[in-house]
Amino acid sequence: MGREAFEAVLRGSKKVPDSRRNRKLRDKVIFGTAFHTPARGRLEVLRDALIVVAGDGRITEVIAQGSGDHDAARARAAEQGRLVELGAGEVLLPGLVDLHIHAPQWPQLGKALDVPLEVWLRKHTFPLEARYADVAFARTIYDDLVSGLVANGTTTAVYFATIHMEASLALAEICRARGQRAFVGKVAMDDPDQCPPFYRDENAATALDEMRRFIEAVRAIAPGGDALVHPIITPRFIPSCTDELLAALGRLAAETGCLVQTHCSESDWEKSFVEQRFGRSDAAVLAGFGLLRQHTVLAHSNFVSDDDLDLIRARGAAVAHCPLSNAYFAEAVFPLREALDRNVRVGLGTDISGGHSPSLLDGCRHALMAGRMRQGGVDAGLPRDRRGVADARITVAEAFWLATAGGGEALGLDVGKFAAGCKFDALRIDVEADGSNVRVWPDLDEPEDVFQKIVLNAGRANIRQVWVDGVCVGGTAGDAGQRASVSR
C-alpha cells in the first residue's frame, strides 16, 4: 500500500518536515490527523485539525477542519513559521503514561520469567537492585532505560527506584535531562523479617530521614509547580515495611503533599500475609496508615474486594493495571471491568521487569487479552456458563484510554488527550515506517480501523517523534528529523 492510499483513508496532508529539538520552540501549530480517547471508551478522530501549542507546552486550542477560523489560522501559523505539518502516512497520538516501572530491573528485562516468584526475587531481583549502591552503574542503566522508554512512546513514567539515595536521585536527574515527565520514588523497605540483610533500610528512622531528603533534593533539581519530574513516596509494599515506617510515611505524605505509590493485593501470598498481620485488606491497611490518598498509585490490586474498590475510589487513589506481569507472577487477573464500573481511577503499567515488554502499546494488547480470557474463561473442562466472568472484556478504545488519559487522571495530570489546557505530550506515528506491521487498505479501512491497527500493531519503529511538554525529546527521526524547519 502506498502513501497515497493511506491518505485516501485519513484524508491527510502533504508531508512537511518536523520541528527542531529546541525548548524555545514549544510555540507551534500542528496540522494533521490525530486520534485520542478523551473519555473512557470514546474514540475521537481529529481529521486535518490544528493543534495550537503555546510556549509553556500547553495546548491552547484545537481547531477542527471546516471551522470558520481553520484555514486562516493555518495560513497565519505558516506565515509566522510556527506550522508543523504531519506528512503522508503520519498521524498524532497522545503520549503514553506508564504507571508502574521498576527502574533498576531494566537489565533483567526478559530474564527468569520461567521461575517461581521467590526464586525471581531472591536470586535475580534483590541482588541486582543492591548493585545500585554503585552510582556509576546506576547512571549507565538508568540513562539507557529512560531513552529506551521515550523511544517506545512513554512520555510519563512512574518509577520505583531502589533504597539508594544517590542512585535514585540520578534517575530523577536523567529523566529531567532526557525530557521525560516522571515520578521517581526512592524505595522504603525496613522489615528485617521480610527483606534480605544485604538490601534493606537500616531502620524506620533512617528510611524516613532519607525519604524526606530525597523529596527535597528532587524538588530542588526540578523546582516549580509545573516541573517535569516529581518525587513520590514509595513503600515497596506492606510486607516489607514495619508499622513504624508505614505510619511515618503516611504522615510525610500529608506534610509534603507528595503522591504515594506501592503494591497492593498483588498475589495470594501478599493478601494472606497482610490479613494475618492486620486482620484487614491491603487497601484498608494503607488507608489506616494515611497512605491511601488522592492519586496514590496501587500496583496490581488483583485480589481486591468490592469494598476495597469502593474505598480506593472514595480516597481518590488509582490502580496501575499490569496485565502482563500479573500473568507471570500474580496468577490472577485484575477485575478491571468491575473497577471501571465503580469509577475507580485506573491506568496501565508495564511493570518492568515482571513484565518483559517496555512498550505500553503492548500493555494495551495485554489488557485486551486479559479481559477476553477473563470473560471466556480458561478451563475448557468447565461448562461454558461457569468458565468466565460476564462482560469482563474491554474495547480497544478503552485500552488506549487506560494508557493515556486514564493514566493522566490517575496522577492528576492534564495529559493523555488533545484539549485546551492539556500539556502537549504526543507521538508522531508513521504507519509507513521501515519494518512497520501496520497495513492500511483504503477500500476496507475507516479511520477508526486505522486507529485500532496502530494500537494493536505499531511499535517503536513507527514512532517518528516524541513530544513532552511541547518539546521533541525522541523518536526515529533523530538528528535529521530535527534539522528541518517548520513550513512557511
Predicted regions and their residues:
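C-terminal cap of metal-dependent C-N hydrolases
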Residues: 39, 423-484
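Metal-coordinating catalytic core of metallo-dependent amide/deamination hydrolases
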Residues: 166, 170-301
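Alpha-helical scaffold segments that flank or form the walls of functional sites
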Residues: 109-180, 209-225
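N-terminal metal-binding scaffold of metallo-dependent hydrolase/deaminase domains
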Residues: 1-79
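His/Asp/Glu-enriched, well-ordered alpha-helical/loop segment
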Residues: 34, 288-295, 336-438
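Catalytic core of soluble alpha/beta enzymes
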Residues: 266-296, 301-317, 327-338, 354-362
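Active-site gating loops and adjacent loop-to-helix segments of metal-dependent hydrolytic enzymes
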Residues: 107-140, 191-205, 268-295, 315-318, ...
